[in-house]
């Protein structure tokens, strides 16, 4: 739980019209040191470490990606490729990018521009595995076999910059539009981009609610986002009663 709490406390959580949870000028931000200290203490146990060193940027494994970036396996009908300014600027994200393959897969999965990029790489996974995908950073090229790339359920192996909530007022059926904000950067070109991946899941809603409530119980900090989520949760028809502490114990 401490590990999940740490992850949730470092990312930017927003609710509907961008209500910030943590920022440098907020009371919440001052509590991060306590949270980090708890995580450091937790990781002294024999439990395998699930996070990169706290004060260091993540070291990516080129052969491991989250399922958010897994390209579609089905070939789509070919249509025209729209060469827009945005499409051209995306090429700057790829040129000499140390994370070229990861960035390419993110663009292919981008809900806002996926049709264009799927047309550009139409059905590439249906080719012979011997063909593979070759990325080149300056004169350094590497060939990848798509079937050998490992996709994991842990979204945080990618550069997740935050989460975004748009929770519906309609509680007749569960709908919680949770978006993962993926940060892309090409340091060689000074280009950045944020891609939003919608991910609707009651389990994820419960997990985040548990983490925020645990943080509240441990620190006494009042969180606006927690109040909104608890209000919404209490109105769901399939919640028989409001939990006194956590929705789930695990």
UniProtKB/Swiss-Prot annotation:
Disulfide bonds: 136-141
Topology relative to the membrane: Peripheral membrane protein
Pfam family, one: Cytomega_gL
Keyword Cytoplasm in annotation: no
Record GO biological process: fusion of virus membrane with host plasma membrane; symbiont entry into host cell
Keyword Signal: yes
N-terminal signal peptide: 1-18
Record's keyword terms, sorted: Disulfide bond, Fusion of virus membrane with host cell membrane, Fusion of virus membrane with host membrane, Glycoprotein, Host cell membrane, Host Golgi apparatus, Host membrane, Membrane, Signal, Viral envelope protein, Viral penetration into host cytoplasm, Virion, Virus entry into host cell
Family: Belongs to the herpesviridae glycoprotein L (gL) family. Betaherpesvirinae gL subfamily.
Chain ranges of the gL betaherpesvirus-type domain: 31-239
Entry function: The heterodimer glycoprotein H-glycoprotein L is required for the fusion of viral and plasma membranes leading to virus entry into the host cell. Acts as a functional inhibitor of gH and maintains gH in an inhibited form. Upon binding to host integrins, gL dissociates from gH leading to activation of the viral fusion glycoproteins gB and gH.
Compartments, record wording: Virion membrane; Host cell membrane; Host Golgi apparatus, Host trans-Golgi network
Domain of life of the organism encoding this protein: Viruses
InterPro entries: Cytomegalo_gL (IPR002689)
Subunit: Interacts with glycoprotein H (gH); this interaction is necessary for the correct processing and cell surface expression of gH. Part of a gH-gL-gO complex.
Official protein name in the record: Envelope glycoprotein L
A single Gene Ontology CC term: membrane
